[in-house]
UniProtKB/Swiss-Prot annotation:
The keyword Transmembrane applies. The gene is MT-CO2. One of its GO terms (molecular function) is copper ion binding. Its cofactor is Cu cation. This is Cytochrome c oxidase subunit 2. SUPFAM superfamilies: Cupredoxins, Cytochrome c oxidase subunit II-like, transmembrane region. Residues 46-59 are mitochondrial matrix. It comes from Anisomys imitator. Keywords: Copper, Electron transport, Magnesium, Membrane, Metal-binding, Mitochondrion, Mitochondrion inner membrane, Respiratory chain, Translocase, Transmembrane, Transmembrane helix, Transport. Component of the cytochrome c oxidase (complex IV, CIV), a multisubunit enzyme composed of 14 subunits. The complex is composed of a catalytic core of 3 subunits MT-CO1, MT-CO2 and MT-CO3, encoded in the mitochondrial DNA, and 11 supernumerary subunits COX4I, COX5A, COX5B, COX6A, COX6B, COX6C, COX7A, COX7B, COX7C, COX8 and NDUFA4, which are encoded in the nuclear genome. It comes from the Eukaryota. Binds a dinuclear copper A center per subunit. The lineage of its organism: Eukaryota, Metazoa, Chordata, Craniata, Vertebrata. The keyword Signal does not apply. It is found in: Mitochondrion inner membrane.
Length: 227
């Protein structure tokens, strides 16, 4: 989860988020080098006494500043396309969970089980227990098995919402009349927090998401107790 005054991304918990973090660092380094080069050229132009006011044609320079940006864009595009394909790839999911956005709560249905569904509301500040997080705790957490591919089917009953869990690299729009899907895979157990990331009305800020990733045995015990 995010902390006050945090710099950088949240710790990666899924393979997709690890790839996104690496791509972020890769792109940031390219942007830093370009910015440094531009700043150096500007300082050079401001401090040098030499001028070339009569220069009308410089084909070598024009060739360089045409080819170089194209190469840089390719270096950014190739890893980006690879990650996009990885995010859309879903192979043999172990579990499917249907997520519906409402004003202003989430409802979940485990489609592989009969009658395993519930609504998830934010816990009001006055009802929080010591150690619980304001605006992030819910009355019903989404319990999922770790280290297994899980398919999330995401839609909405009313207006646009967005189901997002940053530490897992997830952000999928919930659109009325349309079913989007995403893959959830966690490398370790724990609680992972998210929020609705699409302005959806007056209580938009009060739609938290809490995923509880547990070992498979614990998940089986939980699902048996819920049915």
């Amino acid at each position: 989860m995010a902390y006050p005054f945090q710099l950088g991304l949240q710790d990666a918990t899924s393979p997709i988020m690890e790839e996104l973090t690496s791509f972020h660092d890769h792109t940031l380094m390219i942007v830093f080098l370009i910015s440094s080069l531009v700043l150096y050229i500007i300082l050079l132009m401001l401090t040098t006494k030499l001028t070339h006011t009569s220069t009308m044609d410089a084909q070598e320079v024009e060739t360089i500043w045409t080819i170089l940006p194209a190469v840089i864009l390719i270096l950014i595009a190739l890893p980006s396309l690879r990650i996009l394909y990885m995010m859309d790839e879903i192979n043999n999911p172990a579990l499917t969970v249907k997520t519906m956005g409402h004003q202003w709560y989430w409802s979940y249905e485990y489609t592989d089980y009969e009658d395993l569904c519930f609504d998830s509301y934010m816990i009001p500040t006055n009802d929080l227990k010591p150690g619980e997080l304001r605006l992030l705790e819910v009355d019903n957490r989404v319990v999922l098995p770790m280290e297994l591919p899980i398919r999330m089917l995401i839609s909405s009953e009313d207006v646009l919402h967005s189901w997002a869990v940053p530490s897992l690299g997830l952000k999928t729009d919930a659109i009325p009349g349309r079913l989007n899907q995403a893959t959830v895979t966690s490398n370790r157990p724990g609680l992972f927090y998210g929020q609705c990331s699409e302005i959806c009305g007056s209580n938009h800020s009060f739609m938290p998401i809490v995923l509880e990733m547990v070992p498979l045995k614990h998940f089986e015990n939980w699902s048996a107790s819920m049915i």
